[in-house]
Design a protein with these regions (language model features):
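Transmembrane alpha-helices of multi-pass inner-membrane enzymes
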Residues: 32-37, 356-368, 372-394
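Hydrophobic transmembrane alpha-helices and their immediate junctions
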Residues: 38-40, 122, 193, 226, ...
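Membrane-embedded alpha-helical segments of multi-pass membrane proteins
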Residues: 21-43, 83-94, 166-175, 214-222, ...
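Long extracytoplasmic/lumenal interhelical loops at the membrane interface
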Residues: 263-277, 281, 285, 289-330
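A membrane-periplasm/extracellular boundary helix in multi-pass inner-membrane enzymes
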Residues: 64, 129, 228-268, 277-285, ...
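Alpha-helical transmembrane segments of multi-pass inner-membrane proteins
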Residues: 111-145, 150, 159-228
Length: 394
């Protein structure tokens, strides 16, 4: 049993780093962990511990609500597929609670988290190096366009065509680790190396040009200036304002991803606003109890067609807002349940770890512009860290 506990400990530790690779890698790790932990998961002592963990119960309930919604959906096939996608919200809490029964050296504590940070940062920079090397090769030896390979989808392409938004989310977390974690390293040039890596991460995030993660990066940097450098509040306010104005002007006038937000008259024309309007229209029509996932896509398609939202129709856009997505799925009661879940997660981070607190804060912002909990790369990321926060031993 001791050997199995060691194996599961390390598999659980490397799981978030597997998100930089093809999604089958993380899915395989979760499946192996579940098979290893089955004998422990369904023991009475484990289930008794689970009942005391509100965050884990909320996660499992999220899966069960989708399962119950299958009874009311017209499109069973799509509903079953969505249930398969969110399986991590059921499986990872069941895996996670078993670590509560481990001996102290194999529990989820600060030693575990420190190892996780080392692995995540190392794999993250391997991913950055791979993307930059691929871009350099394509531009200089493959007759590729610099505007494509050093930018957005082209830059993220070698990581099994991961969507740049999700890569940027992971790098936001990596940036938080670099800035706020106290590294126990005795390297001679430790601080120089650290700041070179921070600068490289910021440059890479700018090249990726994922807008919401750039906003989050800016907030993380401001919080670092305030918390770690102990800057006077007036100086901080002036610095923040200066950086904000400079950043906005630089990005809007030099980056196509930001230029396309406005038309020639300077009026906002972002298609995401049209998507939100359509999603809100669907949510308003099913305000109290929502509409099952299997039927939501059809309803959104009808609204997009009615509102002439061509891009949303062609690309089958979801709500692009997790709060709206939940309102559409389960109505106002489902949204209130979701907010309560997030409250418990955030409250747990206040007492245990600043970096986790930043992570949850970042996720709350991501939810405003993406339906992260509808995509595998986002589902595993969120279900893993919500579980980790719940089982973390101070």
């Amino acid at each position: 049993m001791s050997k199995i506990n060691h194996i599961s400990y390390w598999l659980f530790l490397v799981l978030p780093s597997a998100l930089f690779f093809e999604k089958i890698v993380a899915s395989t790790l979760i499946a192996v962990l579940f098979l290893i932990k089955i004998p422990i998961i369904f023991q009475f002592k484990t289930l008794k511990l689970l009942i005391k963990q509100k965050i884990l119960l909320f996660s499992i309930l999220y899966f069960l609500l989708h399962a119950i919604a299958l009874l009311f959906t017209i499109d069973i096939e799509d509903g079953l597929y969505s249930l398969e996608i969110i399986l991590s919200f059921l499986v990872l809490p069941l895996i996670g609670i078993t670590f509560k029964r481990n001996n102290k050296p194999l529990q989820i504590n600060r030693h575990f988290v420190e190892k996780l940070f080392y692995v995540f940062v190392s794999v993250g920079f391997l991913a950055i190096a791979l993307c930059l090397c691929n871009a350099f090769y394509k531009v200089n030896f493959g007759n590729g366009s610099k505007d494509y390979w050093f930018f957005y989808r082209g830059l993220a392409h070698p990581l099994w065509q991961i969507h740049p938004i999700y890569l940027a989310y992971y790098l936001n977390f990596l940036l938080s680790i670099l800035l706020f974690h106290d590294w126990n390293l005795k390297w001679k040039f430790r601080e120089y190396i650290k700041w070179i890596l921070i600068l490289l991460t910021i440059i890479f995030l700018i090249l990726l040009s994922a807008r919401t993660p750039l906003v989050v990066s800016f907030i993380i940097l401001i919080l670092f200036i305030y918390h770690r450098l102990k800057v006077h509040k007036v100086a901080l306010a002036l610095t923040t304002l200066s950086l904000l104005i400079t950043s906005v002007l630089a990005l809007v006038f030099t980056n196509n991803r930001f230029k396309e937000l406005f038309n020639e008259n300077g009026i906002l024309q972002e298609d995401r606003v049209q998507t939100w309007r359509g999603a809100y229209e669907v949510a308003s029509d099913h305000f109290w109890f929502g509409i099952p996932k299997g039927d939501l896509d059809d309803e959104l398609e009808k609204v997009y067609r009615k509102n002439n939202h061509t891009k949303g129709l062609e690309r089958s856009y979801n709500c692009h807002n997790q709060y709206l997505q939940l309102l559409c799925y389960f109505g106002i009661f489902g949204l209130l349940y979701f907010i309560l879940w997030l409250y418990y997660v955030y409250r747990a981070t206040i007492d245990n770890h600043l970096i986790f607190q930043l992570l949850v804060f970042s996720i709350l912002i991501y939810f405003c512009t993406e339906s992260i909990m509808s995509v595998n790369k986002g589902i595993v990321f969120i279900s893993y860290f919500f579980t980790l926060i719940a089982i973390y031993e101070k």
